[in-house]
Amino acid sequence: SDVYKRQTDTVHDWVGGQKDLAQRRLRTIGNPAQRFAEDHLRLLRAVRFAAQLDFESEPATLAAVREMAGRITRVSAERIRDELLKLFRPPHAARGLDLLHESGLLAQVLPELLPTVTCDQSPDYHPEGTVYNHIRLMLSQLPTEAAAALPWTVLLHDIAKPVTQSVSKEGRIHFYGHEKIGADMAQKILQRLRFTNVEIEAIVQTVRYHMQFKDAT
């Protein structure tokens, strides 16, 4: 948005980009709806840039993303996958998930995660609360050098808890078999997003056996 004039060593900023940078604010140039209509992948990119840079989207930009979120499905699965891989990289993976949800895009690209937002867990084991809170907490703990598949293992390891939730007579919450059902769900999600067979196998097997890892000594 800025034009640098070498002769006078000055920057001509006709769209207020310098001010937005100083205030850590994300804004499209011109009408947000028009910019997103030019390439619907920009809807996801707006979320990724906000997460990566720790910026806030200005109201009109965020409103346009929310209004147009459904159009992201017009973008190829491969392009969506590549953008999500960048979004869920540490150290901004947890904020990326939150912004994806708040923007309405989570419901479009990873709708299977939506039920985790309200899925309660036993406070004895999960004082952090819902399955969604558990997932975002784990994402926030990922090391920056984590392999690209690891955030996806975290995202999907408890994906089946909402559909397997039961409550005992004593009031305890259980999720019997969620790891096996979750592995099947994870495979379908990753295939839909056109992950490679090698990536799918690694993530799915980790989801399938993650309850055994907690007992390892």
State what each model feature region is.
Residues 1-155, 159-177, 181-201, 209, ...:
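Glycine- and charge-enriched loop/helix tracts that form the active or gating conduit
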